Structure formats: C-alpha cells, structure tokens
C-alpha cells in the first residue's frame, strides 16, 4: 500500500475530527455541515477499502499535523496562507456564454448528488467541448459555478449546475457529474472533450485528446446511467 495514501487518509481523519468539534460547538454554517456529512461517508468508504481503523488513523493524523505545525515558522505559515487560501475564480466561458438561454429538442435531466445535469439527446455526431466557470483553492477545483457543453458551432447542448436546495459539493461530485454528461453525449456518437483549464484543476492532469482520466468507479456510474437512459 502506498504510504502517502495511508498518511493522507490519517490526516483527513484528524481534520474531519477538528471540523466535527467545530460543528458540535454550533460554529458551522449549512454548507460546512453538508460537507462534513459527505466527508464522513467518504472516510468510512476509504477506511473500509484501505482496511484502516478510523479512530487509530485519527490519532496518527493528529501526530502528523502537530509535527508539521511545530516545524512551521510563523513567517512561513503566513506566506503559505497568503498564497494558498486565496480562492481564485477561473472562467472558460464569457458572460454571454454563461447567461445565454438555450433549448432542448429531446431534454434529459438527471440529479447527481448536489448537481443537476441537463442534456439534449437529439444532438448526434457532433464535436463537443465542455467549458466551466469555477473557483479554485489549493490548486484544485473548489466550487463549480456553471458548466456547459458547446458544439463547434457554439450551440449549447448540455449543462451541469449546482442545486440551490443542496448547497455544497465536492471535487468528486463534479467529476462524477462530468462523467455522466460525457457518457450521455457520447451515446449518440458525439465526440466530447474537456477544456484544459477544467482538466487541470478537476483532475490535475491534461490529455491532448481532452478526455479526463475517469476512475473505474466513475466509468461504472457512467455506464449505469447510459443503460438507464436507453
């Protein structure tokens, strides 16, 4: 087992414990509590997969964090906070592309967790690119504002947007939703690629063909979704 995978899990367990203490003192808002619940389920799944006890991992994670904080000088901490904690807003789409109304000949809508996926199933044999506007923190996609699928002619044929009634979503939520949208569009022989900006901050990688590196879990979910639509 990769030691970095273990240490990452241990630190995540301890940080979840800290956030839980914050929630217990009624200091967390609704999105904070929503992420807390989602991350708890995620940690349970990861612990089961890795065969690690969460309570033990939390104690080890605490030791790792305490060691890092002890070694960190105040000046270095200030510089890290200033450079890393500032959330950036990145835009693939123009204001016109974001605000433009669009219509579907054969509408399909699916809710995936806190995200709503919409696509036009009448679109066939097109070259499509996915563009998104989103915020980034720690070099990773933090919050999706809006994602849209465009043909080469500029027509909008698909969309992923957060559900107002379910605030808060994770990077994994976004990647899973993108996998579902790609699967739905490719079912009609469309060629789909993802913008380099979105690839970089959602997957931290970039492929020349514009295809994101979907995990086996995301591929299975995409396949199940496609079968349910046929």
Curated annotation (Swiss-Prot):
Homodimer. Interacts with host TRIM25 (via coiled coil); this interaction specifically inhibits TRIM25 multimerization and TRIM25-mediated RIGI CARD ubiquitination. Interacts with human EIF2AK2/PKR, CPSF4, IVNS1ABP and PABPN1. It is found in: Host nucleus; Host cytoplasm. A motif (Nuclear localization signal) lies at residues 34-38. Its main location: host cell. It comes from Influenza A virus (strain A/USA:Huston/AA/1945 H1N1). InterPro entries: NS1, NS1A, NS1A_effect_dom-like_sf, uS15_NS1_RNA-bd_sf. The gene is NS. Upon interferon induction, ISGylated via host HERC5; this results in the impairment of NS1 interaction with RNA targets due to its inability to form homodimers and to interact with host EIF2AK2/PKR. Residues 180-215 are annotated as: CPSF4-binding. It comes from the Viruses. SUPFAM superfamilies: Ns1 effector domain-like, S15/NS1 RNA-binding domain. Residues 1-73 are annotated as: RNA-binding and homodimerization. Belongs to the influenza A viruses NS1 family. Inhibits post-transcriptional processing of cellular pre-mRNA, by binding and inhibiting two cellular proteins that are required for the 3'-end processing of cellular pre-mRNAs: the 30 kDa cleavage and polyadenylation specificity factor/CPSF4 and the poly(A)-binding protein 2/PABPN1. In turn, unprocessed 3' end pre-mRNAs accumulate in the host nucleus and are no longer exported to the cytoplasm. Cellular protein synthesis is thereby shut off very early after virus infection. This is Non-structural protein 1. The keyword tRNA processing does not apply. HAMAP family: INFV_NS1. One of its GO terms (molecular function) is protein serine/threonine kinase inhibitor activity.
